[in-house]
């Protein structure tokens, strides 16, 4: 860790008491800043608040007093807090610099950074990259950080110059970077998402592309080549472009040909040997292969990871098999593209559990994926009726409306047959009923476990 002096004696306001906010506050205090943390909510568990206060950090909860902006030099913002927030907009009006926590991580670390962004596939790709970089490694370590759960500023304090920090970065986080400079940037894909936060699709794309804004010709930009828009976006980076393509549209990086995974001229392994299901996971694997090859990893290291890695929690996660029905938790599928790709990964008939927050979309786009594959749907949440309409148009035989992803489980089992896949892949955010997609997925798994126990008792 570099003990930089730029924050010594500065007044910093950390907005938001989440993991990243707490770690940023502690780090800034260590760097000599005068730190105040503010959150509009007062947490029921005061453990973190007391920890911060014990380190000499002022904590103010319950509201956003405007006087907190007086004489501050910097705001470190929780990425989920919108720029329309009264303190954030006030800071902008005053010309106060606003950053997010990954920026701090970059500033204090000598490690190499790999930044991964995109609409879908970020977490799985980030995890695959770290596993490949660590496979067979005798010197240096790859850390996973960022939007995946471990704050980058926490990891950055441990990592050395021999290490690599593989950081999953959301569009929200990328809006708050100014100097963050990844040796390798990865763009998995870009679809329409978070328009409620960014206002327009163009703003969303621009936020994502901030990941390359500080790259030079000595860096690498790994980009999905299967879409013309994404190809064009690669021109925004000064770095060396390394494409990956499931459709074989470029052979200059990682791609699929004849049922095999390749890197340039190098045949690595059969596509069918990837353990995690789904065409989307083929794309994730290709992105990870490209990064692994940039860092000189062997085919054997790559094969070991792809043939053993069973997936990330809430991303087409296998839960259990119950009387010939396989249950999968894909709660992370918060948009239609993610659900389309999840469905494409299964050959067996599917009972689909879907629905959630209404963001103003209709679901006609899902209909081709539902046809001839989904024989039953259990729909729930604010979009239940819209989801049911798409199912009806696609010719789905049975459509049942229920309260949520928990009550959907026994209903799904009732309409399923031996050999079916029962898939939670909502195509919607969880916020109408659950605080996060992780909570939704965990509740789904608990409901499956409860159903298993009930059936065993009969």
From Swiss-Prot:
Residues that bind ATP: 118-124
Family the UniProt entry places it in: Belongs to the MurCDEF family.
Summary of the function given for this chain in its UniProt record: Cell wall formation. Catalyzes the addition of glutamate to the nucleotide precursor UDP-N-acetylmuramoyl-L-alanine (UMA).
Superkingdom as given in the UniProt entry: Bacteria
Subcellular location: Cytoplasm
GO molecular function list: ATP binding; tetrahydrofolylpolyglutamate synthase activity; UDP-N-acetylmuramoylalanine-D-glutamate ligase activity
Keyword NADP (UniProt): no
InterPro entries per UniProt: AlaDH/PNT_NAD(H)-bd, Folylpolyglutamate_synth_CS, Mur-like_cat_sf, Mur_ligase_C, Mur_ligase_C_dom_sf, Mur_ligase_cen, MurD
Protein name as annotated: UDP-N-acetylmuramoylalanine--D-glutamate ligase
EC number of the protein: 6.3.2.9
């Amino acid at each position: 860790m570099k003990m930089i002096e730029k924050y010594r004696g500065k007044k910093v306001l950390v907005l938001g008491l989440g993991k990243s906010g707490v770690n940023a506050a502690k780090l800034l205090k260590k760097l000599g800043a005068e730190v105040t943390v503010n959150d509009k909510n007062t947490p029921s568990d005061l453990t973190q608040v007391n920890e911060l206060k014990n380190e000499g950090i002022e904590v103010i909860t319950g509201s956003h007093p405007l006087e907190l902006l007086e004489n501050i030099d910097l705001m470190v913002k929780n990425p989920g807090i919108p720029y329309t927030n009264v303190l954030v907009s006030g800071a902008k009006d005053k010309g106060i610099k606003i950053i997010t926590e990954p920026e701090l991580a970059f500033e204090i670390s000598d490690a190499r950074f790999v930044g991964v962004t995109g609409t879908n596939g970020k977490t799985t790709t980030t995890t695959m990259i770290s596993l490949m970089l660590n496979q067979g490694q005798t010197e240096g370590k790859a850390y996973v950080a960022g939007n995946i759960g471990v704050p980058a500023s926490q990891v950055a304090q441990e990592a050395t110059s021999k290490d690599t920090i593989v950081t999953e970065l959301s569009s929200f986080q990328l809006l708050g970077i100014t100097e963050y400079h990844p040796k390798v940037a990865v763009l998995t894909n870009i679809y329409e998402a978070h328009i409620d936060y960014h206002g327009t699709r163009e703003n969303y794309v621009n936020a994502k592309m901030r990941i390359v804004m500080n790259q030079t010709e000595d860096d690498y930009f790994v980009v999905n080549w299967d879409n013309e828009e994404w190809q064009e976006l690669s021109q925004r980076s000064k770095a060396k472009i390394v494409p990956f393509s499931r459709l074989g549209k470029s052979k200059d990086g990682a791609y699929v040909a004849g049922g095999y995974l390749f890197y340039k001229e190098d045949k690595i392994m059969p596509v069918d040997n990837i353990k995690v299901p789904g065409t989307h996971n083929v794309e994730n694997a290709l992105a990870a292969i490209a990064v692994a090859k940039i860092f000189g990893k062997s085919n054997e290291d790559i094969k070991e990871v792809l043939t053993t890695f069973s997936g990330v929690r809430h991303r087409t996660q296998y839960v259990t098999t119950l009387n010939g029905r396989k249950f999968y938790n894909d709660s992370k599928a918060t948009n239609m593209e993610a659900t389309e790709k999840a469905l494409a990964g299964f050959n067996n008939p599917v009972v689909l559990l879907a629905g959630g927050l209404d963001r103003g979309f209709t679901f006609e786009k899902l209909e081709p994926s539902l046809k001839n594959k989904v024989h039953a749907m259990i729909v729930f949440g604010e979009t239940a009726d819209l989801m049911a309409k798409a199912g009806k148009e696609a010719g789905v035989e049975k459509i049942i409306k229920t309260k949520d992803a928990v009550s959907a489980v026994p209903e799904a089992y009732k309409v399923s047959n031996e050999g079916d896949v029962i898939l939670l892949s909502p195509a919607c955010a969880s916020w109408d009923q659950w605080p996060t997609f992780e909570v939704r997925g965990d509740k789904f798994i608990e409901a499956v476990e409860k159903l298993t126990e009930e059936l065993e008792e009969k």
